[in-house]
Structure formats: structure tokens, C-alpha cells
């Protein structure tokens, strides 16, 4: 007894449908129709009525007649989503009965970004194997459009079994200066064309190793991110060259076949294709994927390819491997937290406002602090010189030696810190004489030009009566009370000569410190310094305020002039 299959045997063939959503999807469908791809049905769905009328397919769906009114989505994904929801029943009627659906769209706009996820969800809910092939915008289209595209791709990936992403920016990898704008987009559409043709050839074209649709579903069902590639070559090394061209598609989203879990390989050639060439091409692709990957291989013949070989590859399950690799890169970001801790420990003894000053002051030696406190002559000279003033005066006022910058705003603590301890730090003076004070006085008295000295004496005699400046004397007496110890210096000069002061600056200071407190003779020193304007112009101006300290110098100069 014979059993006949009911119906037409043609109805049992797998049905593959390509639906283009939006303007970019409609253009891809038109290019595939122009390439005369067989065994595939084409559908276009758009909110723009004008774009639908230019389509080459007769199966058209006007999305959102009420929402968009045939005017498009205006680059607003929410309008495209609402339009697809409104016309979803009509879309389902068009794709009913299909075993596999390729949804192609351009991400970043309104219709493709909003309607493609809705259509993919409906197709997958009806048990249809759904593959998404989408493009990303160029860089010159702006960051806003790129963010819209990335959000739409993330949403679309939840409703498709396999997703293939083609960035338009990668067209510059294959385009030249003479490549037209239309030809560049046709290159992107060829990725979709080669992927669909690789699947249909396995099921339609005759061959020694044919595959059924169940094998394709096994490789592509719920595999996530995928890549498609096709390579064609001729010559002695056509097998290797075609395989390498298929696995290195420059237009895809920087994907690699490393770690792919499912691989579909289709090798097509003429009747002159040898077994060695098929083995060589298949092994080249197998070396790139996971050793445990599910590889489905098929080979067909095409009389038009005599002397050539074409290798088509669909690698799926790439997203799961790529997501596992970036995990170790998140671990080395907590080390900089230990940097502020040493700063707090270094300045813990001082106040919060003086922490930077304490850190810099710790490098100064303790002997320098003792020398600065035991020499009132140097204090008077440092006040006259504005440069070293912030370096010595704060150290004298601070007995703790930790906060040298705390005494900068006021000079009154200088007299308070000097009273209880006037002579305890005189020993370091014998060890470290200050050359700055002696060199200043030596340069001042070793001038051989006696004409300048006589002019200075006459000038001081005239100006001593005109400008006594009594208002500054109590300030100097209050701030620098122990400074009268410099008065015995003229006695040392009388006994030891002009250069005796250079040799004994420290020995003459400690004996007569508490004896004399005369502010009047100290007011004559500013008269001597303005007399010598050639070398001491910068030092004479601030020393006028210390007139009570420098009156002994003109008396000495008068005796030298006589």
C-alpha cells in the first residue's frame, strides 16, 4: 500500500522572510531584490508613505496610520513604537507561516529604533526563528543619534535569537576616495545579502552535503550576538583566501570568531572543487572557533563558480564569550585612597589650617632656629630685607618649633617669647656666626671712598634735625626690646679698628645686652644708608624705620672721616 504526502511538496520547504523596517531597512530590501536573491520573501514596513511607494516589493505595511499619518516618525523612537503597536496585527499577518525572519533596520532614527523591537517580539512569540541585522549611524551623525541607536540595539537584543550589528563607520575601512555614497551603503547591505544567501543556499542549492532547517535553528536559536561573513577567491590558494576573507569581515562591529559556540559553514564551488580544498577551508575556520563549538558544515555546487570558491560563515554565541573577558579589568581602582592618609599623620600636631606649613617646616634644622633666636642683629637686618623676613621671624616667635607660619600675621609675640629666655641660646652663636650681618657691615665700612663718607656725615647732620621720626621708636622698642645689645659694637670698633668687628661679631654681643636701652642713637643708621645709594639703595629704605638702632654708625663715620 502506497502512502502519499498530502498537499503540494513545495509547501513543506522552509519559508524565509526578510522584513525591512524604516528607511534603511527598505533600502536594504531593494538592494537584495536587485541582486535577485532566490527562495526569500520580502516585506517592507514604514511610517513614511512616500518611502513605501518607492519599494520594489508588493508586500508593504503602512505603520501607524493614525499615529504617524504617513508622515514618518520624525526621529522619535516612541512614535515608531506606537505606530508598530497600532499596525502589529497586519505585520503578524504578513509574516505568518515563516520559519525564519530576518529583520533589518537602521538604528538611530524613529521607525527603525522604535518599531523593530516590537516586530521582533511578535515574531518570536509566534515561534519564528528571528535574526536581526541592524546598522549603527556614522560618527558625524552626532552623539544623540548614537545613544538612541545603542538603546534600541539593547532592546532589540532581548527579542531576537541572533543579532548582527554593522556600524556604518566601518565602511571607511573598505571605501576609497572614489567610492560613491550609494556604493558605500550597498557594501553594508551586502553583509545581509551574503548572510541570507548562505542560509538559503544550504537548503535550496543541490550539493553533496545538504543541511535542513533544523540544523540552522540549532546553530542560531538563542545565541545572542553573531557575525556573518562571505569570502570568494580564485587561483591556487582560493580555499585559504576565501576562508580568511569570510572570517575577517571588516564591516562588522569589531567582533571575532574567538569563542563562538555555534558555527555554520557553507562552501560553494564549481564542479572542479576538490576534497583537499574543502578540507583546507573548513579547517581554517575551525581553528578560529572554540574547540567545543557546534559546527555544522555544508557544501553545494554552482556551475557559475567554475574556477572560484565561495565560503560563507555564520558564527553565533559570541556575546557570551565577550562578556566574560572584561571582568578582570575592574579590579585595580581602589589604591589611590591611601594617598591623603600620610598628609594627615604628618601634620597632626598642628591645626588644620597650618598643615601645609608644618610639613615644609620640618625639614629645617634645629640649630638654625637657635642661631636666629640668639642674634638680634640679624633680626634687625632681616626686617630691613623683605626677602628673608618670613623665614626668620616666625621661627623666633614660635617656641614649639612646629608652627613657623603661625606668627606671620603679627609681630607682637616676638617680644613675649624673648623675655623669659634671653641667654639660654647664646652658645649656638659661637658655633655658627652669621655671615650675613658681618658681610653687610663690612661692605658698609670698607668703602675706601672717603668723599662719600663726608657727604654722608653732612647729609645726616642736616636730616637728623629735620626728620627725627619719634612715632616709629616705640614700635621698635615694643617689638624688639633686646636689640640694644648692638650698642657695644662702636666700642669694639674703637678698640679693634675698622675690621675688628668682622672678626668678633658674636663675642661683643652677649656682654652688653641688658645694659643699654637707648632708642635715640639707633635713629641715625638710616641716615648713613641713604648716603650710599650706589650699592645699598634697596637696604636703606626699610632701615629708616629703625633710626634708634643705627645712630652709632654716623658717629663712627665722623671719626673715620676726621
UniProtKB/Swiss-Prot annotation:
SUPFAM superfamilies: Tubulin C-terminal domain-like (SSF55307), Tubulin nucleotide-binding domain-like (SSF52490). Disruption phenotype: Essential; it cannot be disrupted. Although it colocalizes with paralog FtsZ-like, the latter cannot replace it. GTP binds at residues 23-27, 110-112, 141, 145, 189. One of its GO terms (biological process) is protein polymerization. CDD domains: FtsZ_type1. GO terms for cellular component: cell division site; cytoplasm; microtubule. Residues 418-428 have a biased composition (Basic and acidic residues). Its main location: cytoplasm. The keyword Transcription does not apply. GO terms for molecular function: GTP binding; GTPase activity. Residues 404-413, 464-486, 500-510 have a biased composition (Low complexity). It is found in: Cytoplasm. Residues 404-428, 462-562 are annotated as: Disordered. InterPro entries: Cell_div_FtsZ (IPR000158), Cell_div_FtsZ_CS (IPR020805), FtsZ/CetZ (IPR045061), FtsZ_C (IPR024757), Tub_FtsZ_C (IPR008280), Tubulin/FtsZ-like_C (IPR037103), Tubulin/FtsZ_2-layer-sand-dom (IPR018316), Tubulin/FtsZ_GTPase_sf (IPR036525). Keywords: Cell cycle, Cell division, Cytoplasm, GTP-binding, Nucleotide-binding, Septation. Belongs to the FtsZ family. Homodimer. Polymerizes to form a dynamic ring structure in a strictly GTP-dependent manner. Interacts directly with several other division proteins. Interacts with FtsZ-like protein (also called FtsZm). Essential cell division protein that forms a contractile ring structure (Z ring) at the future cell division site. The regulation of the ring assembly controls the timing and the location of cell division. One of the functions of the FtsZ ring is to recruit other cell division proteins to the septum to produce a new cell wall between the dividing cells. Binds GTP and shows GTPase activity. Mild overexpression impairs cell division, leading to very elongated cells. Isolated protein forms filaments and bundles in the presence of GTP. HAMAP family: FtsZ. This is Cell division protein FtsZ. It comes from Magnetospirillum gryphiswaldense (strain DSM 6361 / JCM 21280 / NBRC 15271 / MSR-1). The gene is ftsZ.
Amino acid at each position: 500500500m502506497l502512502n502519499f504526502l498530502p498537499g503540494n511538496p513545495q509547501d513543506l520547504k522552509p519559508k524565509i522572510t526578510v522584513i525591512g523596517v524604516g528607511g534603511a531597512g527598505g533600502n536594504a530590501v531593494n538592494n537584495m531584490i536587485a541582486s535577485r536573491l532566490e527562495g526569500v520573501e520580502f516585506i517592507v514596513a514604514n511610517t513614511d508613505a512616500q518611502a513605501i511607494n518607492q519599494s520594489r516589493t508588493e508586500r508593504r505595511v503602512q505603520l501607524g496610520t493614525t499615529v504617524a499619518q504617513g508622515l514618518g516618525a520624525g526621529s522619535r523612537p516612541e512614535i515608531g513604537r506606537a505606530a508598530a503597536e497600532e499596525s502589529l496585527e497586519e505585520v503578524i499577518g504578513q509574516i505568518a507561516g515563516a520559519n525564519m525572519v530576518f529583520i533589518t533596520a537602521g538604528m538611530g532614527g524613529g521607525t527603525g529604533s522604535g518599531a523593530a523591537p516590537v516586530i521582533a517580539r511578535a515574531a518570536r512569540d509566534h515561534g519564528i526563528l528571528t535574526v536581526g541585522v541592524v546598522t549603527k549611524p556614522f560618527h558625524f551623525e552626532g552623539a544623540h543619534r548614537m545613544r538612541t541607536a545603542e538603546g534600541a540595539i539593547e532592546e532589540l537584543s532581548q527579542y531576537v535569537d541572533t543579532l548582527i550589528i554593522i556600524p556604518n563607520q566601518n565602511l571607511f575601512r573598505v571605501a576609497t576616495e572614489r567610492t560613491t555614497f550609494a556604493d558605500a551603503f550597498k557594501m553594508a547591505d551586502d553583509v545581509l545579502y551574503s548572510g541570507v544567501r548562505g542560509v538559503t543556499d544550504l537548503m535550496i542549492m543541490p550539493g553533496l552535503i545538504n543541511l535542513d532547517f533544523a540544523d540552522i535553528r540549532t546553530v542560531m536559536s538563542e545565541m545572542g550576538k553573531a557575525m556573518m561573513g562571505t569570502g570568494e577567491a580564485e587561483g591556487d590558494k582560493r580555499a585559504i583566501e576565501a576562508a580568511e576573507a569570510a572570517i575577517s569581515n571588516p564591516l562588522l562591529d569589531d567582533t571575532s570568531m574567538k569563542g563562538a559556540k555555534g558555527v555554520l559553514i557553507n562552501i560553494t564551488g564549481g564542479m572542479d572543487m576538490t576534497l583537499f580544498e574543502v578540507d583546507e577551508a573548513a579547517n581554517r575556520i575551525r581553528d578560529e572557533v572554540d574547540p567545543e563549538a557546534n559546527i555544522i558544515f555544508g557544501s553545494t555546487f554552482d556551475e557559475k563558480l567554475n574556477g572560484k570558491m565561495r565560503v560563507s560563515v555564520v558564527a553565533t554565541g559570541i556575546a557570551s564569550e565577550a562578556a566574560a573577558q572584561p571582568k578582570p579589568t575592574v579590579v585595580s581602582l581602589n589604591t589611590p585612597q591611601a594617598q591623603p592618609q600620610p598628609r594627615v599623620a604628618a601634620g597632626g600636631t598642628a591645626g588644620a589650617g597650618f598643615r601645609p606649613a608644618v610639613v615644609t617646616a620640618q625639614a629645617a634644622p634645629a640649630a638654625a632656629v637657635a642661631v636666629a633666636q640668639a642674634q638680634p642683629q640679624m633680626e634687625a637686618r632681616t626686617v630691613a630685607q623683605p626677602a628673608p623676613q618670613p623665614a626668620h621671624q616666625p621661627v623666633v616667635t614660635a617656641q614649639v618649633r612646629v608652627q613657623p607660619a603661625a606668627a606671620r600675621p603679627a609681630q607682637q609675640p616676638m617680644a613675649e617669647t624673648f623675655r623669659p629666655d634671653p641667654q639660654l641660646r647664646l652658645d649656638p652663636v659661637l658655633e655658627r656666626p652669621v655671615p650675613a650681618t658681618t658681610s653687610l657691615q663690612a661692605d658698609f665700612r670698607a668703602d675706601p671712598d672717603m668723599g662719600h663718607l663726608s657727604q654722608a656725615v653732612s647729609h645726616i647732620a642736616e636730616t637728623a634735625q629735620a626728620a627725627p621720626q619719634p612715632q616709629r621708636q616705640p614700635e621698635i622698642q615694643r617689638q624688639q626690646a633686646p636689640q640694644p645689645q648692638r650698642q657695644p659694637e662702636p666700642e669694639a670698633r674703637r678698640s679693634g679698628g675698622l675690621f675688628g668687628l668682622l672678626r668678633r661679631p658674636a663675642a661683643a654681643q652677649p656682654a652688653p645686652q641688658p645694659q643699654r636701652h637707648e632708642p635715640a642713637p639707633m635713629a641715625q643708621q638710616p641716615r648713613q644708608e641713604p648716603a650710599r645709594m650706589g650699592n645699598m639703595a634697596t637696604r636703606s629704605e626699610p632701615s629708616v624705620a629703625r633710626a634708634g638702632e643705627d645712630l652709632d654708625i654716623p658717629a663712627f663715620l665722623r671719626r673715620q672721616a676726621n
